[in-house]
């Protein structure tokens, strides 16, 4: 055993490679061992340090791979399971327990997180050289009994399936101890690099190999000063010193201090000695010279976006200076927080990069496919799950138009549940092409229908049916077609996902092939495996910027290093124990165990680990290190790392980097896409300072260059303005939609729509767009139902009592096909019908026979011409006649309505006046009867707040007051309207005033007609207070935003409440006079 150490300013890898090269020349077989997280980088570093840059005698590997190398040809080798396979084994084990058998974990049997924790515990017991029986010292006996029961079942399953129940390292250690490998090992030298501690499993292997290998050489970083110190707690080198001292005691050897030929820049050495002095309590400090200040710099940025952009531009400058991408390393304090932002900005700056981290499959279409399939079976064909499966793009062959049409029908007919999906669609023949829909349904659902009928059977049979199902829906062909149009890098990602998917299927076949499973269990197993699976990518080329977590970095890793997100929250990283075994329980087990096995207690190693990670980070660069921190991290303020505060205190430069400055140097441009992005950002922003002459010159030249580039590619810089100008509809479209020889057809509702927002009229009446319909009744259907009840009721002139007539009307309406199908679909529809019947009975109290009023007609259609250019169509719900022969119009409403002269003036309430105009100009009646009014009847079941009712008589009175006609009435007919059924307060108008209202109403139609025929429709939803928009905005179509486009809204003309009535009448009269002129 040889132990070597050197300080952080020298290169331990170079030292160990020299040892390996000399041993290889002497004829020894060398195995160079590196940690799992550093194996790729370490292999490259070793090869670069070898004199010939290659050697057949030297193998760079890991402990686990070393075990496989020596035991590959050993007899009785069992099949190993990966994490997904182990998860399936634990799932199968937990499924075997009956309810109540597991006292602590019984409710977590199917929980994916719990199964993942069990897998982690299983692997940790192996690396700790412990067995499940060693957990008997847990605080809770019930917890130990549950874990023991679970692991015993798992052991039985592994033994039955002839799977390997020990790690490769443990098996290798047994083989070494047995002496079976002595011949192979006697000519072997083992070199270990990059470790500051060994797991119990690795330590046991080292002990076994130490007496059988020719030599074991272990290297670590530590200064002579630190190694000779009596007290090392808190020392920056404590991890390496404690590691060396433990090995020295265990193997009875003295560590040797050695120097490499390569030595870091003096500036890094000076900073490292200052940091060491702060942590070994000697307070030895060295004033930093300019060389040291050039080595390390701290940047403070505004947010993550600016932070990454500054680094991206710095990388582009290094390329401008002649360096390569491979000379640059980017480290992240929190990979998850920075990954998306860094990916977008690096692609914008054309910087190729490689993330040294396993990627999850959760966002892949194949995972969505499996998740949707599992949900379909579990939740019995919810519409959203079925549609999500079809939308993955890898299920079946269907055009986007057909899929949209199918989705529209599913929403309309509320298709859900297997019965509705697997039978022909029959509802909605008037609105949809059922033949086309059923063809689509058959092609999409036939394979699914057959697959979901799979019964409980052996896993291999279910898997075969699943594979046949995948063939039927063309999964592999669809996935190939989807991937074929992507970049080579993206194709490789999809290939890795597909490989992982097939591995999961193979694991399932191996583990559950002979196990009886139902389809739910089958899909749940595959889906959980897909959700938890990860894959790794190998960089397509060496010349890329490597990106990884800062705690995985080694000293002297690259020429230039940029460490982002070095805030207090992530630097240092505080390890937390999230396993099933607490730290206190781990310590109890370690204390009670007298074997070589022991649990690692990471929370107690935090200080040593973080100190060494910081020291490694500060020496990660060979030329320059930049540490960056954002003021805002994940939209919250964060503090500076204590390690960065130490650097600042010893004199390391601290720069406040603001937003991207407008510098004119050519090397500051970055690249074409980045420059384009900056120009667009500059155009959008409000420049808060005057540019210098040099900046103006730079940007004018840059923009001219960009414009030439964009013009050559047929691209324009997008211009975002506050304008919402619309294009005039072509004359061909207007002629087809509104023939010139025909009068323009309008209605009171169309007019209201026009004055609500002209663009709404365009969408609804020009383009003919409709809201999504449904077979379930909504407010429109409810109103039609009540209309029909009252129509039948008022036509019944029989001798029956009013209650009998009402019940008869309700029953007849309920039996009509249209309402019978609507209100018998499900419990919700039947409940709606009950409410409607109650409303009909409550509202009907106002319709009882009155000697002063008779119903003249119902559902009266009318056509009203204005200047032979406008034809107004409509249907009047009811026309009443008073005893004096005067007529009145009644319009049924399912919501509260009243005549508001202000809304009428602004075009938002023309209905009642239009109806008065229609019956007063009826050509079929020679002798025009007087008009007593036009009114709304709110169909409702009045509700009262009983806390405000003093006695029951008041309750009846208030109910009657709620059921009154509200609208506008003729003052001349006042005496016939004073029976309490009509709300007359502020609602009486003289004949002259009604004439003014009619004239203004016609003017509203004329103005609307002119605009409509012009084909120019504004986006102008109305606003009452110029602060909020009340009209329909259609944001997703128009892009209207109240805060940016309020000036485009149509402000209603308003008057004070006291002046409202007379003021608007005067305005109407003036407008009429001006119109006549």
Swiss-Prot record:
Transmembrane segments: none annotated. One of its GO terms (biological process) is double-strand break repair via homologous recombination. Pfam families: ADDB_N, PDDEXK_1. It comes from the Bacteria. One of its GO terms (molecular function) is ATP binding. Its cofactor is Mg(2+). Its EC number is 3.1.-.-. Keywords: ATP-binding, DNA damage, DNA repair, DNA-binding, Exonuclease, Helicase, Hydrolase, Nuclease, Nucleotide-binding. Heterodimer of AddA and RexB. Belongs to the helicase family. AddB/RexB type 2 subfamily. Despite having helicase-like domains, this subunit does not have helicase activity. The heterodimer acts as both an ATP-dependent DNA helicase and an ATP-dependent, dual-direction single-stranded exonuclease. Recognizes the chi site generating a DNA molecule suitable for the initiation of homologous recombination. This subunit has 5' -> 3' nuclease activity but not helicase activity. PANTHER family: RECBCD ENZYME SUBUNIT RECC. This is ATP-dependent helicase/deoxyribonuclease subunit B. The gene is rexB.
């Amino acid at each position: 055993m040889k132990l070597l150490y050197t300080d952080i300013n020298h290169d331990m890898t170079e030292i160990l490679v020299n040892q390996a090269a000399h041993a290889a020349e002497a004829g020894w077989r060398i195995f160079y061992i590196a940690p799992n997280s550093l194996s790729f980088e370490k292999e490259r570093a070793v090869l670069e340090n070898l004199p010939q840059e290659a050697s057949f005698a030297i193998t760079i590997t890991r402990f686990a791979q070393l075990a496989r190398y020596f035991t590959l040809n050993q007899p009785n080798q069992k099949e190993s399971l990966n994490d997904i396979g182990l998860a399936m084994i634990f799932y199968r084990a937990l499924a075997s327990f009956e309810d109540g058998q597991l006292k602590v974990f019984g409710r977590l049997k199917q929980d994916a997180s719990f199964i993942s924790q069990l897998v982690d515990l299983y692997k940790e017991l192996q690396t700790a050289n412990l067995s499940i029986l060693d957990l008997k010292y847990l605080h809770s006996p019930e917890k130990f009994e549950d874990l023991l029961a679970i692991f015993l079942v798992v052991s039985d399953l592994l033994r039955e399936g002839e799977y390997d129940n020990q790690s490769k390292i443990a098996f290798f250690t047994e083989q070494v101890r047995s002496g079976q490998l002595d011949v192979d090992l006697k000519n072997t030298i083992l070199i270990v690099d990059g470790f500051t501690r060994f797991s119990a499993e690795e330590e046991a292997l080292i002990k076994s190999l130490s007496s059988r290998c020719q030599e074991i050489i272990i290297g670590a970083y530590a200064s002579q000063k630190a190694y000779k110190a009596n007290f090392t707690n808190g020392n920056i080198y404590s991890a390496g010193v404690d590691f060396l001292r433990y090995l020295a005691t265990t193997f009875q050897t003295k560590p040797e201090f050695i120097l490499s030929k390569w030595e870091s820049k003096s500036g890094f050495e000076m900073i490292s000695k200052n940091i060491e002095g702060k942590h070994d309590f000697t307070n030895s400090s060295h004033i930093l010279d300019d060389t040291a200040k050039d080595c390390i710099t701290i940047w403070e940025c505004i947010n993550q976006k600016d932070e990454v952009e500054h680094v991206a531009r710095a990388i582009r400058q290094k390329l401008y200076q002649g360096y390569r991408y491979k000379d640059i390393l980017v480290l992240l304090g929190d990979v998850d927080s920075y990954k998306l932002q860094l990916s977008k900005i690096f692609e914008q700056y054309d910087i190729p990069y490689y993330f040294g981290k396993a990627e999850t499959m959760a966002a892949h279409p194949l995972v969505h496919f499996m998740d949707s399939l599992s949900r379909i079976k579990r939740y019995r064909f919810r519409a959203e799950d079925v549609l999500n499966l079809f939308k993955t793009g890898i299920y079946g062959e269907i055009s986007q138009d057909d899929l949209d049409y199918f989705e529209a029908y599913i929403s309309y007919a509320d298709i859900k549940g297997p019965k509705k999906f697997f039978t022909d669609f029959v509802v909605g023949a008037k609105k949809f092409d059922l033949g086309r829909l059923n063809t689509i349904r058959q092609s999409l659902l036939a394979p699914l229908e057959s697959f979901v009928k799979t019964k409980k059977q052996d896993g291999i049979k279910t898997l075969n049916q699943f594979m046949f199902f995948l063939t039927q829906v063309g999964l592999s062909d669809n996935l190939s077609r989807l991937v074929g149009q992507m970049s080579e890098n993206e194709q490789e990602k999809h290939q890795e996902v597909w490989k992982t998917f097939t591995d999961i299927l193979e694991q399932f076949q191996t583990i559950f092939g002979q196990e009886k499973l139902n389809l739910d269990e089958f899909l749940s197993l595959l889906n959980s495996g897909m959700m938890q699976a990860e894959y790794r990518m190998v960089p397509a080329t060496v010349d890329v910027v490597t990106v990884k977590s800062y705690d995985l970095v080694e000293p002297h890793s690259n020429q230039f290093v940029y460490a982002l997100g070095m805030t207090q929250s992530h630097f240092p990283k505080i390890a937390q124990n999230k396993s099933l075994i607490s730290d206190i329980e781990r310590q109890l087990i370690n204390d009670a165990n007298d074997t070589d096995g022991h649990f690692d207690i990471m929370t107690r190693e935090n200080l040593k680990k973080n100190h060494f990670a910081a020291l490694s980070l500060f020496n990660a660069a060979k030329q320059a290190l930049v540490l960056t921190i954002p003021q805002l991290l994940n939209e919250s303020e964060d503090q500076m790392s204590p390690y960065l505060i130490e650097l600042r205190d010893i004199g390391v430069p601290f720069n406040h980097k603001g937003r991207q400055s407008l510098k004119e140097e050519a090397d500051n441009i970055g690249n074409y896409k980045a420059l384009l992005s900056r120009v667009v950002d500059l155009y959008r922003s409000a420049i808060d300072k005057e540019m210098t002459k040099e900046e103006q010159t730079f940007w004018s030249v840059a923009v001219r260059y960009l414009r030439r580039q964009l013009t050559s590619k047929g691209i324009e810089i997008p211009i975002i303005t506050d304008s919402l100008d619309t294009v005039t509809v072509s004359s061909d479209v207007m002629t087809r939609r509104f023939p010139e020889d025909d009068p323009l057809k309008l209605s009171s509702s169309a007019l209201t729509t026009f004055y609500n927002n002209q663009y709404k009229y365009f969408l609804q009446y020009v383009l003919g767009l409709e809201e999504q319909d449904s077979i379930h009744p909504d407010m429109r259907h409810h109103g039609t139902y009540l209309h029909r009840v009252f129509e039948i009721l008022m036509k019944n002139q029989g001798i029956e009592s009013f209650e009998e007539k009402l019940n008869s009307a309700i029953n007849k309406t309920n039996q009509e096909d249209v309402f019978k199908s609507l209100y018998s679909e499900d419990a919700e529809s039947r409940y709606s019908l009950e409410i409607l019947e109650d409303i009909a009975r409550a509202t009907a109290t106002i319709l009882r026979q009155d000697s002063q009023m008779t119903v003249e007609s119902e559902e009266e259609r009318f056509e009203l011409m204005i200047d032979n250019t406008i034809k107004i169509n409509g249907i009047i719900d009811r026309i009443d006649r008073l005893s004096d022969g005067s007529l009145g119009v009644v319009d049924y409403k399912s919501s509260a309505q009243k005549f508001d002269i202000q809304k009428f003036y602004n075009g938002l309430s023309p209905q009642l006046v239009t109806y008065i105009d229609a019956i007063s100009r009826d050509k079929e009646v020679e002798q025009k009867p007087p008009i007593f009014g036009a009114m709304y009847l709110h169909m409702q079941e009045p509700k009262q707040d009983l806390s405000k009712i003093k006695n029951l008589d008041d309750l009846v009175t208030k109910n009657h007051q709620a059921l009154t006609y509200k609208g506008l009435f003729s003052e001349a007919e006042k005496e016939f309207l004073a029976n309490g059924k009509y709300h007359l307060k502020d609602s009486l108008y003289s004949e002259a005033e009604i004439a003014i209202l009619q004239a203004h109403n016609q003017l509203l139609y004329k103005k609307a007609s002119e605009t409509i025929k012009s084909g120019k429709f504004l986006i102008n939803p109305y606003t009452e207070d110029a602060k909020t928009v009340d009209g329909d905005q259609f944001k997703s179509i128009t892009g209207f935003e109240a805060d940016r486009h309020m000036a485009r809204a149509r402000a209603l003309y308003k008057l004070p409440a006291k002046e409202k009535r007379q003021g608007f009448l005067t305005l109407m009269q003036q407008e009429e006079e001006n119109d006549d002129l």
